[in-house]
Amino acid sequence: MTKPIEFYFDFASPYSYLAHKQIRRIEEKENIKINYKPIFLGGLHKLIGITAAAFINSKAKFMIRDCKMVSKKLNIKFKFNPLFPINSLNLMRGLLSINSNIKDSYIDFFFNAYWQDGLNLNDEKVIFDILKQCKVKKNDFLKKIKDQKIKDKLKKLT
């Protein structure tokens, strides 16, 4: 029996986005399913006591150049978001709180909004518009992201 492949990711990470696009291609081509596991990258950085590359000028410049190069090589539509980095905590919690039948569209919509369309995912109105496209009720989302079980689950995954 084959073990499932798990992909740990955060919407705030450009490398997660690029990997996500490749994963979708592989899933389609090979007819397999990858299990997406949300983490909170900001919390992980804090936990291990490192400063994210986004906050170190030389590393940030390299990351931007690297992501553009990789996206071009792999023919992935990509725009480095000038609002990088975002606080993705509520988006990651939200993924853990929605029905499994809409998780794929939720993931695709939020990744594309941030890394293709350059939208501001720190803006609640933008988030609510995307939730509507995903058929997630705003009030349910707002309630569930505050649920301690959801918070604990994300901490555990991180």
Regions found by a protein language model. Name each.
Residues Y17-D117:
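Structural alpha/beta surface segment adjacent to cysteine/selenocysteine redox centers
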Residues Y8, I48-A52, L142:
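Short amphipathic alpha-helical segments at helix-loop
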Residues F11-A12:
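Short pre-active-site segment immediately N-terminal to redox-active cysteine/selenocysteine motifs
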Residues M1-E6, Y15-K33, S100-S105, F109-T158:
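C-terminal cap of thioredoxin/glutaredoxin-like
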